[in-house]
């Protein structure tokens, strides 16, 4: 099943986990520590109380990362990636409804794939643009760069885990996300060393 189909079929929990996982993997671009999104993950694991806490947690994270409208891009791949990451956080819905979460999960999915494409030297050389992101999300994955392929696999796995196991799948989803965040942090660090 393609990523687009998985998002279309996901329930509120799956959509929230999918969007949050994409955002969490991109935390290195936001300047936050690895635990900054923990309260949002915790609110997903709780039932009705979590729904009430979600909006408050979103606002707290935004305040910690100083996001209003997001930073201006610098024209570099890193600058564009930072803008996309801030847009994901800025688009996080304060109200956890299926419609809000579906839109956010979709935005986060596209942005995360674009970020990984921007930061992957192979993908840049291949000019992996918006049409390629759409192709990837719809299941056309030939000639995909390794970094983008890994991000696509993680997005699909998170949605499948939560669909199959409900709240019990959140722990594994978070573990996958932590792995992806480490990979992106290493890529960002390597690119920074290359510029120095």
Ranges and model annotations:
Residues 1-76:
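N-terminal domain-start signal
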Residues 56-69, 76-89, 105-106, 112:
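Internal, conserved structured core segments that host functional sites
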Residues 82-196:
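An internal, amphipathic alpha-helical element
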Residues 15-16, 33, 78, 94, ...:
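Alpha-helix N-cap/helix-initiation sites
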């Amino acid at each position: 099943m393609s990523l687009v189909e998985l998002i279309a079929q996901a329930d509120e929990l799956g959509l929230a986990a999918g969007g949050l996982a994409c955002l969490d993997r991109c935390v290195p671009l936001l300047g936050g520590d690895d635990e900054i999104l923990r309260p949002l993950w915790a609110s997903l694991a709780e039932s009705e109380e979590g729904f009430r806490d979600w909006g408050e947690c979103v606002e707290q994270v935004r305040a910690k990362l100083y996001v209003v409208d997001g930073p201006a891009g610098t024209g570099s791949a890193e600058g564009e990636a930072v803008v996309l990451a801030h847009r994901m956080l800025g688009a996080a819905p304060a109200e956890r409804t299926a419609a809000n979460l579906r839109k956010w999960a979709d935005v986060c999915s596209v942005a995360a794939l674009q970020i990984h494409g921007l930061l992957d030297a192979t993908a840049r050389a291949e000019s992996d643009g918006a049409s390629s992101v759409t192709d990837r999300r719809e299941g056309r994955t030939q000639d995909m760069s390794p970094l983008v392929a890994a991000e696509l696999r993680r997005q699909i796995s998170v949605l499948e885990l939560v669909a199959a196991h409900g709240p019990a799948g959140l722990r594994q989803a978070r573990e996958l996300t932590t792995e992806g965040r480490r990979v992106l942090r290493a890529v960002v660090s390597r690119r920074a060393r290359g510029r120095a």
